[in-house]
Every structure is written in C-alpha cells, then in structure tokens.
Amino acid sequence: SPEVMKSLSENFCKAMDQCKQELNLPDEVIKDLYN
C-alpha cells in the first residue's frame, strides 16, 4: 500500500540522516547514491 511505502521511505531518510551525521558525509555523496 502507498502508506507502507511512505513510512518506509521516511524511515530510510531518517536512517540516511543519521549515517550522514555519524560519518560526516557531504551531501554530494548522498546525491551520487540517488542518481
């Protein structure tokens, strides 16, 4: 269902933000992952 996908992507974004902060990744690295 769309709601499941929405919560999954929200959780994924939260996890990515935490990883970014812990590893001090620049946003460019994140953009590379998405492309």
From Swiss-Prot:
SUPFAM superfamilies: Insect pheromone/odorant-binding proteins
Record key words, sorted: Pheromone response, Pheromone-binding, Transport
One GO term (biological process): response to pheromone
InterPro entries referenced in this protein's UniProt entry, alphabetically: PBP_GOBP_sf
Tissue specificity of this protein: Antenna.
A GO MF label: pheromone binding
Ion transport listed as a keyword: no
Role this protein plays: This major soluble protein in olfactory sensilla of male moths might serve to solubilize the extremely hydrophobic pheromone molecules and to transport pheromone through the aqueous lymph to receptors located on olfactory cilia.
Family per similarity comment: Belongs to the PBP/GOBP family.
Protein name: Pheromone-binding protein
Organism: Hyalophora cecropia (Cecropia moth)
Source species taxonomy: Eukaryota, Metazoa, Ecdysozoa, Arthropoda, Hexapoda
